[in-house]
Amino acid sequence: DNWWPKPPHQGPRPPRPRPKP
């Protein structure tokens, strides 16, 4: 399933840290 050009992968995105009060 690589018949369509995909953007370069930069690895898995880390979860956004929740802002602590």
Swiss-Prot record:
Where is it made, tissue-wise? Expressed by the venom gland.
Task: Give the consequence of mutating N2A.
Answer: No effect on binding to nAChR from T.californica
Q: Which GO terms describe its cellular component?
A: extracellular region
Changing R18A does what?
A: No effect on binding to nAChR from T.californica
Q: Which superkingdom is the protein from?
A: Eukaryota
Task: Using the record, list the residue span of the signal peptide; answer none if the entry has no such feature.
Answer: none
Q: Where is the composition biased (Pro residues)?
A: 1-14
Which parts of this chain are annotated as the region Disordered? 1-21
Q: What is the effect of changing P12A?
A: No effect on binding to nAChR from T.californica
Note the subunit structure. Monomer.
Name of the protein in its database record:
Azemiopsin
